[in-house]
């Protein structure tokens, strides 16, 4: 299928500002779009933390939050109001602030961050809900949600119902503050294959609801910080393990360079783990005294997240393609995103009817993943732009019997037919892709799909963009095509039969084909009444008849008398 480029419709120009892609919106529209997305995120955030219900996938929420920050920076707007953390409903102060963790984009960023730092350890970045555990006199005294990092909600009653969280401690941990992640316990969770499973939202939901005490049995705890704990990391891990926080020791590895971090990251991505993860955290063994911890200022640790299985992508244009059979397909052009090291800048939406049902317009944010063989796939529309400017699709009069001859309205189906006849399923013209066919047709103005047979070597050589070697190769391919058997030419003319059925018919000339009845076609493999009728319609089509006579004049095998 080829792009109906004259019908392509784009709305956004993009420019770079501080390394980020910015939409070229008028100020009024930028303010409106930012306000709408900000409000939507705030609504989702409120539902998530107050009701324990996720109205949107965790990854989608995170990516749209990042998109909002990007837009705010593009227009020089303060990003402090971005709703990426829980609403501050709780008033319980944390004994030690939650610093959060800086995100590193790639291995190069990891190398830069590690440079000059020593005694480094890597841990899986467990995906759940952050909590502070306060032990006093050997007993769990308080449990506080992360909140804004300085204060949160008192979760003590719920946390005491989670069997995996020790209720008593001894020794140095008898009076201690711990920070960690409450997670959904999994058996043999392979992150690469199973994904995030919206684990964070599920945990939040269990902690928010009042009627599900039994569900808390499925929660676990991963301690990632012991403020003012033992300075020696192995000693710290050993004491945590003895106290019942064994996962921290099991999943903490000393690392010296980015290669070791990358190796651990890949291993945890592909191995069976007892929890969902979304990357790794690298941390220094030596930490500042707890009184110096502040939200957003934890420069002794950093995260290297896994690339998302699906990416939120901005639709930059809607285009239509018309295949050789006349089928119109809608394609969304995207501001490029990276999925599994693949640059994705377009995704097939499907038919016009499906596109209309999806209600996708330029400016919308869609979720894209990779299906089998790395083909981009549209998963859902996660955010719609206020402006709904959509292109008008081409007329739907195209079908399997149109555009054997070139015309202004037939350009795309005509090109699709040329691409088809040059494919290995037809004449096998090596090196003849869409770009080559477009160049030849644009220069020499083909009358019909076989007009290229009349080109001279000089005409091909004079085609703009064709080097000498390429033009000579095309000339050879065109001459070799003349020797192809009759059945290959019939396939090039898009007879509605499979190659197996055509071979079974035994026809080796146009004259034989004209003598066949509908009953004959019905008896061929994979050819029923409907397909047999289509063969008759194809054979009797005036354009097909004219092409057969033209091929006869060119002395193509099977078409002459």
Curated annotation (Swiss-Prot):
EC number of this enzyme: 6.5.1.2
Enzyme class: ligase
SMART domains, per the entry: LIGANc
GO MF entries: DNA ligase (NAD+) activity
Record-linked PROSITE patterns: DNA_LIGASE_N1 (PS01055), DNA_LIGASE_N2 (PS01056)
Gene3D superfamilies recorded: 5' to 3' exonuclease, C-terminal subdomain, DNA ligase/mRNA capping enzyme, Helix hairpin bin, Nucleic acid-binding proteins
Catalytic function, reaction form: NAD(+) + (deoxyribonucleotide)n-3'-hydroxyl + 5'-phospho-(deoxyribonucleotide)m = (deoxyribonucleotide)n+m + AMP + beta-nicotinamide D-nucleotide
Catalytic residues in the record: 125 (n6-amp-lysine intermediate)
InterPro entries hit by this protein: DNA_ligase_AS, DNA_ligase_B, DNA_ligase_CS, DNAligase_adenylation, DNAligase_N, NA-bd_OB-fold, NAD_dep_DNA_ligaseB, NAD_DNA_ligase_OB
Biological processes, Gene Ontology terms: DNA repair; DNA replication
SUPFAM superfamilies: DNA ligase/mRNA capping enzyme, catalytic domain (SSF56091), Nucleic acid-binding proteins (SSF50249), RuvA domain 2-like (SSF47781)
Keyword tags: DNA damage, DNA repair, DNA replication, Ligase, NAD
NCBIfam families: PRK08097.1
Function field: Catalyzes the formation of phosphodiester linkages between 5'-phosphoryl and 3'-hydroxyl groups in double-stranded DNA using NAD as a coenzyme and as the energy source for the reaction.
Similarity section: Belongs to the NAD-dependent DNA ligase family. LigB subfamily.
Protein name: DNA ligase B
């Amino acid at each position: 299928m080829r792009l109906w480029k004259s019908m392509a419709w784009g709305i956004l120009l993009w420019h770079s500002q501080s390394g980020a892609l910015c939409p070229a919106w008028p100020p009024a529209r930028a303010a409106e779009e930012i306000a709408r997305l900000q409000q939507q995120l705030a609504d989702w955030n409120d539902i998530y933390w107050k009701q324990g219900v996720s109205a949107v996938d965790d990854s989608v929420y995170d990516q749209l939050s990042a998109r909002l920050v990007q837009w705010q920076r593009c227009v020089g707007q303060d990003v402090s109001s971005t709703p990426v953390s829980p609403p501050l409903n709780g008033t319980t102060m944390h004994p030690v602030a939650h610093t959060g963790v800086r995100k590193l984009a790639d291995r190069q960023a990891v190398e830069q961050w590690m440079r000059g730092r020593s005694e480094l350890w890597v841990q899986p970045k467990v995906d759940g809900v952050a909590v502070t555990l306060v032990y006093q006199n050997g007993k769990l005294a308080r449990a506080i949600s992360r909140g804004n990092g300085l204060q949160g909600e008192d979760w003590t009653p719920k946390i005491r119902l989670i069997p995996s969280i020790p209720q008593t401690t001894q020794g140095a941990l008898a009076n201690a503050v711990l920070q960690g992640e409450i997670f959904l316990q999994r058996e043999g969770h392979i992150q690469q294959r199973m994904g995030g499973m919206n684990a964070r939202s599920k945990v939040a939901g269990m902690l928010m609801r009042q009627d599900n005490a039994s569900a808390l049995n499925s929660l676990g705890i991963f301690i990632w910080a012991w403020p003012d704990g033992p300075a020696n990391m192995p000693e710290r891990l050993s004491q945590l393990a003895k106290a019942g926080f064994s996962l921290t020791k099991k999943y903490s590895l000393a690392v010296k360079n980015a290669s070791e971090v990358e190796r651990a990251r890949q291993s945890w991505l592909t191995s069976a783990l007892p929890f969902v993860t979304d990357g790794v955290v690298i941390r220094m063994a030596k930490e500042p005294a707890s009184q110096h911890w502040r939200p957003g200022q934890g420069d002794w640790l950093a995260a290297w997240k896994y690339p998302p299985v699906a990416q939120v992508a901005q639709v930059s244009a809607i285009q239509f393609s018309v295949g050789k059979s006349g089928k119109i397909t809608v394609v969304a052009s995207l501001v490029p995103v990276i999925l599994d090291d693949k640059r994705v800048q377009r995704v097939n939406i499907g038919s016009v009817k499906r596109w209309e049902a999806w209600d996708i317009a330029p400016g919308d944010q869609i979720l894209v993943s990779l299906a089998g063989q790395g083909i981009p796939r549209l998963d859902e529309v996660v955010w719609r732009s206020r402006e709904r400017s959509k292109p008008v699709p081409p007329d739907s009069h195209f079908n399997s019997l149109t555009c054997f001859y070139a015309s202004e309205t037939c350009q795309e189906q005509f090109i699709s037919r040329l691409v088809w006849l040059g494919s290995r399923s037809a004449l096998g013209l090596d090196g003849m892709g869409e770009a080559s066919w477009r160049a030849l047709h644009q220069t020499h103005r083909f009358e019909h799909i076989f007009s290229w047979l009349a080109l001279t070597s000089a005409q091909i050589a004079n085609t703009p963009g064709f080097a000498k070697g390429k033009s000579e190769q095309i000339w050879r391919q065109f001459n070799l095509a003349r020797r192809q058997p009759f059945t290959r030419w019939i396939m090039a003319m898009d007879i509605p039969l499979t190659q197996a059925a055509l071979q079974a018919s035994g026809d080796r000339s146009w004259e034989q084909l004209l003598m066949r009845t509908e009953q004959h076609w019905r008896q061929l493999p994979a050819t029923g009444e409907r397909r047999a009728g289509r063969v008759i319609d194809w054979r009797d089509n005036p354009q097909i008849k004219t092409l057969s006579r033209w091929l006869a004049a060119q002395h193509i095998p099977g078409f002459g008398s």
